[in-house]
Design a protein with these regions (language model features):
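Glycine/small-residue-rich loop that forms an oxyanion/phosphate-binding "nest" at active or ligand-binding sites
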Residues: 79
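N-terminal pre-ligand scaffold of iron-sulfur
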Residues: 1-56, 74, 84-100
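Short cysteine clusters
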Residues: 42, 61-64
Length: 100
């Protein structure tokens, strides 16, 4: 299982952060010492979510305006097209992300 380990301070606060790992684009979102991670791709037209705007816990895709709750990945525009959150653990200012 691929794993990323980085410092919490490497992830900007309340701003989408793009990270490439093993050829896969990821978007990390840090809010109140919580970090969420998703594949950096809108399910609608595959625009990078890291280029989108983050406001009030919602990230908006720049392509067609689809909006996603960053805590759950739920699409607020078309609920059947939600994002699948990756497993994230924050411990002692370290962030570990795993996915299959």
């Amino acid at each position: 299982m691929p794993k990323i380990d980085l410092g919490l301070d490497e992830i900007p606060f309340e701003a989408p952060f793009r990270l490439e790992f093993n050829g896969s684009p990821l978007v990390l979102i840090r809010t109140n010492n919580t970090v969420r991670a998703f594949v950096d791709r809108c399910p609608h037209a595959h625009w990078p979510l890291s280029d989108g705007e983050l406001k009030n816990g919602v990230i908006q895709c720049i392509g067609h305006g689809w909006q996603f709750d960053v805590q759950t990945g739920r699409c607020l525009t078309v609920p059947v097209c939600s994002l699948k959150p990756l497993s994230v653990l924050v411990h002692q200012d370290r962030v570990c992300i795993e996915w299959e």
